[in-house]
């Protein structure tokens, strides 16, 4: 699949996959940002893109940032719809007790292109019964069976 990219910032980098088997490609910051402890920050990527109809871009946390710095994409996965043409930006949450400094060019998130499907919603009076029913939020427990 070919994705058209428009660079709208001089520091913008065209995304690329780091390995042959990578599902995600890196998204790079175009300006310095300091995210205070237990706060969020908006990081500019400096690109706009055009996805084919039927696809979305998911913006996901990089595992190294989560493990080593307690920094994550707040709405992970963030969704970039195929009809959006504005700049890609990433909401990062700093869960640590220290400032997190984003430098120009830092790989701050990863993007994954996913196929999307349109559902048809049908109103009904009652749903099919299941053994689980309406149990949720821990209703199945956490211990091994």
From Swiss-Prot:
Q: Which Gene3D superfamilies match?
A: 2.70.40.10
Cofactor(s) recorded for this entry are: Mg(2+)
Alphabetical keyword list: Hydrolase, Magnesium, Metal-binding, Nucleotide metabolism
The superkingdom of the source organism is Bacteria
Keyword Magnesium among record annotations: yes
Q: Name one GO biological process term.
A: dUMP biosynthetic process
> Pathway it belongs to?
Pyrimidine metabolism; dUMP biosynthesis; dUMP from dCTP (dUTP route): step 2/2
Name the NCBIfam families on file: dut (TIGR00576), PRK00601.1 (NF001862)
Q: Which family does it belong to?
A: Belongs to the dUTPase family.
Which HAMAP family does the entry mention? dUTPase_bact
The protein in question is named: Deoxyuridine 5'-triphosphate nucleotidohydrolase
Q: Which species does the entry assign this protein to?
A: Helicobacter pylori (strain J99 / ATCC 700824) (Campylobacter pylori J99)
């Amino acid at each position: 699949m070919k994705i058209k990219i428009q660079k709208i910032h001089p520091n913008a980098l065209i995304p690329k996959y780091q390995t042959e088997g990578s599902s995600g490609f890196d998204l790079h910051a175009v300006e310095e940002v300091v995210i205070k402890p237990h706060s969020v920050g908006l990081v500019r990527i400096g690109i706009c893109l055009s996805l084919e109809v039927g696809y979305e871009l998911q913006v996901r946390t990089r595992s190294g940032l989560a493990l080593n710095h307690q920094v994550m994409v707040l709405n992970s996965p963030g969704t970039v719809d195929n009809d959006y043409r504005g700049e890609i930006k990433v909401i990062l949450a700093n869960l640590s007790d220290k400032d997190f400094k984003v430098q120009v060019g830092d790989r701050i998130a990863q993007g994954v292109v996913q196929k999307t499907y349109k559902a048809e919603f049908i109103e009904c009076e009652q749903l099919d019964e299941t053994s689980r029913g309406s149990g949720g939020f821990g209703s199945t427990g956490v211990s091994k069976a």
